[in-house]
From Swiss-Prot:
Species of the source: Wolbachia sp. subsp. Brugia malayi (strain TRS)
List of catalytic residues: E145
GO biological process: translation
Name this protein carries in UniProt: Peptide deformylase
Cofactor(s) this protein cannot do without: Fe(2+)
Protein family membership: Belongs to the polypeptide deformylase family.
InterPro entries (UniProt xref): Peptide_deformylase (IPR023635), Peptide_deformylase_sf (IPR036821)
Binding, Fe cation: C102, H144, H148
Alphabetical keyword list: Hydrolase, Iron, Metal-binding, Protein biosynthesis
């Protein structure tokens, strides 16, 4: 299957809340496979369906970074996942600031403050309800991709001035590459 095109900001699809997936069928499974292929081809860690123009509550991710020492027992910090209709049920009070990037905002990265740990409920490709306790980059990626499903770009977590500068840079990038 050919890789899918990634939607680049500014684009109204990236600021639109995605709708719930009502059933998992072969079409959804094929979409998920194409999303993984697209994510790997773009060398990303995660990809939300809205980033390929599909306004459904699905994202994929593959975090194979080194485990962070000192993470609490029972929390995952690596793994390959497809999350359908995800919902964060618990966020830690403890927060951490790390640099993030995004396939939909190329050639930029910004320091973003996010909760360090979380619990998320979601459906897998077998339509089974799953619960995951996540930490480290896995927790960060879940929050980043879930923001996409809610129509929020990660740069929205910046100050207004930094957000405006990031959007101007994104607009310039998009104009340059659309020629």
């Amino acid at each position: 299957m050919p890789k899918l095109s990634i939607v680049v900001a500014p684009d109204e699809r990236l600021t639109t809340r995605a709708s719930e997936v009502t059933g998992i069928n072969d079409k959804i499974k094929e979409l998920v496979n194409d999303m993984f292929e697209t994510m790997y081809n773009a060398e990303g860690l995660g990809l939300a369906a809205v980033q390929i123009g599909v306004l459904k509550r699905i994202f994929v991710m593959d975090i194979q970074l080194e485990d962070i020492k000192g993470e609490p027992v029972g929390y995952e910090s690596t793994g390959k996942f497809c999350m359908i209709n995800p919902e964060i049920t618990e966020l830690s009070d403890e927060q951490v600031i790390l640099k993030e990037g995004c396939l939909s905002i190329p050639e930029q990265s910004h320091e973003i403050r996010r909760p360090k740990y979380l619990t998320v409920k979601y459906k897998d490709l077998n339509n089974k309800e799953q619960t995951l306790k996540a930490s480290g980059w896995l927790a960060r990626c879940i929050q980043h991709e879930l923001d996409h499903l809610n129509g929020i770009l990660y740069i929205r977590h910046l100050s207004k001035l930094k957000y405006d500068m990031a959007m101007k840079k994104a607009e310039k990038f998009k104009r340059h590459y659309e020629r």
